[in-house]
């Protein structure tokens, strides 16, 4: 895979992510804020963006979504076998909820 292919894939992923974020925010804002890990301010901006603005933002060569499993405890919950899937998901949700939301600086 060459550099141009990677940039194209990143743009496509960004577009999908932004469109999904808008849909999630429109359907259930509180759940979307939690699942996306974003602030109210960022949610407001995403909801007011036009399709043209979404496409323009998506075409950057930088990923707009980020890997939220910075904490080794969260990564361990995902990678280790667990007997009770419901308990595993609850523990992961609690750990993710403790993380700060993304802010616009």
From Swiss-Prot:
Subcellular location: Cytoplasm
Gene Ontology BP annotations: bacterial-type flagellum assembly; positive regulation of DNA-templated transcription; regulation of bacterial-type flagellum assembly
Pfam family, one: FlhD
UniProt keyword list: Activator, Bacterial flagellum biogenesis, Cytoplasm, Disulfide bond, DNA-binding, Plasmid, Transcription, Transcription regulation
Sample GO molecular function, one term: DNA binding
InterPro entries on file: Flagellar_FlhD, FlhD_sf
Keyword Transferase: no
Top-level lineage group: Bacteria
GO cellular component: cytoplasm
NCBIfam families: PRK02909.1-1
HAMAP family: FlhD (MF_00725)
Function description: Functions in complex with FlhC as a master transcriptional regulator that regulates transcription of several flagellar and non-flagellar operons by binding to their promoter region. Activates expression of class 2 flagellar genes, including fliA, which is a flagellum-specific sigma factor that turns on the class 3 genes. Also regulates genes whose products function in a variety of physiological pathways.
Complexes and interactors: Homodimer; disulfide-linked. Forms a heterohexamer composed of two FlhC and four FlhD subunits. Each FlhC binds a FlhD dimer, forming a heterotrimer, and a hexamer assembles by dimerization of two heterotrimers.
Family to which this protein belongs: Belongs to the FlhD family.
Domain-level remarks: The C-terminal region contains a putative helix-turn-helix (HTH) motif, suggesting that this region may bind DNA.
Name the record gives this protein: Flagellar transcriptional regulator FlhD
Annotated organism of origin: Ralstonia nicotianae (strain ATCC BAA-1114 / GMI1000) (Ralstonia solanacearum)
